[in-house]
Amino acid sequence: WAVIFDMRRGTMGVVEYRGYSVLMSVYHKEKPEYLKQAIESIQTQTLSTNDFVLVCDGPLNESLDSVIAAKQQEMGKTLNVVRLAKNGGLGNALNEGIKYCKNELVARMDSDDIAYPDRCEKQIAVFNTHSEVSICSGIVEEFTTDPNTVDTKRVPPETNAEIVEFAKKRNPFNHPCVMYKKSAVEAVGSYQDFYLLEDYYLWLRMLMAGYQGYNIQEPLLHMRAGSDMYLRRAGWKYAKTQARLFKFMRDSGFIGNSQYIKSCVIRSGSALAPNWLRKFMFEKVLRK
């Protein structure tokens, strides 16, 4: 697939982006009503997309396929459905999907979240006024059942300097509402296998390669977190993955040995703690 750069030259020779792609992955356990809401939140954007890539990560079910078929009727060629033969996980699905994205700017979207109507317009404005930015996210509002009832807000650091410093300890971008330059993501090897941390690993490689980020200090997305999210961030496998990520940072010179040890102790302690304690840490410490 050839990449179609939907942009024009503005004043002073600065590139102005107009079009953007949307990249979403869905698998068989997703609820059809959530997928419908997620897609419709993109359909109602104040700045419309001309390229929506929906990756089906393995065979789905009749209910999900019905939602997709209805949306294909509504959206026509704008909705490009990519079906993978088997479920390979989020990172693999996004790697396949990004190949089909026709625009330089790609907006990530999860299949159970709800974007604010002006989310993409605000992000496009950042790229048009800050040519140095290659990745942009913003505030997400987590909810359990009603998007108007906010459980908590995830507020990422704003400037690139703050992002780099924050990344030494925690994920500096909210992946569900990230928009990035396709060329920058592909230049560092795109998403790679890293259990539950594929996005964090990608951001680190981008930052280390000199690509800059920015986080809009306004809500861009309603994120369906659920009250049991802390349960998915547990166990030896997750603890070892986190330790491997911080080892990568240390070995790359991104952090020192003291920060490596501190991060491993804190993160492993959280992953291996009893559920009640991890829930407290997740809600009161790690999400703040």
Task: Report residues per predicted region.
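Conserved donor NDP-sugar-binding/catalytic core segment of glycosyltransferases
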Residues: 118-151
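Catalytic beta-strand/loop signature of glycosyltransferases that borders the donor
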Residues: 139, 213-220
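Catalytic core of nucleotide-sugar-dependent glycosyltransferases
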Residues: 223, 231-256
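Acidic donor-binding loop at a coil-to-helix junction in glycosyltransferase catalytic cores
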Residues: 195-204
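Glycine-rich, basic loop-to-helix element that forms the pyrophosphate-binding segment
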Residues: 84-101, 122
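Short, well-formed alpha-helical segments that are part of the catalytic scaffolds
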Residues: 29-44, 50
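Short, flexible, basic/aromatic active-site loop/helix in glycosyltransferases
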Residues: 139, 153-171
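Short aromatic/hydrophobic "clamp" motif used to bind/position activated sugar donors
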Residues: 106
